[in-house]
Regions:
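Bacterial signal peptide processing site
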Residues: 22-24
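Bacterial N-terminal signal peptides that target proteins for export
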Residues: 1-10
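Post-signal-peptide N-terminal segment of Sec-exported extracytoplasmic proteins
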Residues: 28-31, 35-75
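Compact alpha-helical subdomains of small soluble proteins
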Residues: 56, 68-129, 137-142
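Short, solvent-exposed mixed-charge patches
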Residues: 147-148
């Protein structure tokens, strides 16, 4: 009888342990999902490009771009952000160093670009932690863009 009692107690403890595991919280959504997936990222990118076009500190860089070129830029930017945030996209465009070679982008222009992205994120109510994580994910590109 005692052996049966110990076996029963062992089964009860095992069952409770397994049920605790089964009810554990799912992992938090990744950065891509917190940004609203591809749709949310595309909206932010659209607002970002609008901000850049209106910003006299940087808009001369885009003055010769026409509709299809702007749409390609938006698509490439959305792919980059999607890729950098753990989404299912792959950025297939040229690397940043090649794209920006000879442009001599300044630190001030980089800062204006970051400000315009933050403004787009704020407009779309992206939280502080998510915003900070996104900027951190994109920050390594700076070395391949500024001063090239």
């Amino acid at each position: 009888m005692r052996l049966t009692g110990w076996i029963g107690l062992g089964l009860l403890i095992t069952t409770l342990g397994l049920s605790a595991c089964a009810t554990s919280e799912p992992p938090p959504p990744n950065l891509y999902k917190r940004l609203g997936g591809r749709e949310g990222i595309s909206i932010v990118v659209g607002d970002f490009v609008t901000n850049m076009a209106a910003d006299t500190r940087v808009n001369a860089r885009f003055k010769d771009m026409k509709g299809p070129e702007i749409e390609k830029l938006k698509s490439n930017l959305a792919d980059q952000i999607c890729d950098a945030t753990g989404g299912p996209c792959s950025y297939l465009g040229r690397d940043m160093k090649t794209v920006h070679k000879g442009m001599k982008i300044t630190e001030a222009e980089w800062n204006a670009t970051v400000e315009n992205l933050v403004k787009a994120l704020d407009k779309n109510n992206v939280g502080a932690q998510t915003k900070s994580e996104l900027l951190g994910a994109l920050a390594p590109m700076k070395a391949d863009i500024v001063g090239q």
